[in-house]
Amino acid sequence: MKIIYVDLDGVVADFDKGRSEHPLSGVTPYIGRPDKLPGVYENLAPIPNAIESVNKLLKDSNFKVYFLSTAPWDNPEAWMHKRLWVAKHF
């Protein structure tokens, strides 16, 4: 069995779109630090076809799939929101 690590941001979750549409994205102190935007990870849209692609891997017994991501240490809600995002979509 092969192991596959799947990143979230920019791979299956559209962080760039979520960042640009966030109401505080142009407000100090978030300029240049979009990862600190409150709730930015909570409602990210999936990247087109990403969910279907990962689901194919999850159903294939030849692969063990793990989601691999990180969040800023000083944005503790980001860890929870990323976990909830995975649970919602997979």
What are these regions (language model features)?
Residues 1-44:
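Active-site neighborhood of HAD-like aspartate-dependent phosphohydrolases
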Residues 29-30, 82-84:
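General N-terminal targeting signals
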Residues 45, 50-80, 86:
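Substrate-recognition element of Asp-dependent hydrolases with the DxDx(T/V) motif
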Residues 88-90:
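Short, intrinsically disordered, charge-balanced linker/junction segments flanking boundaries
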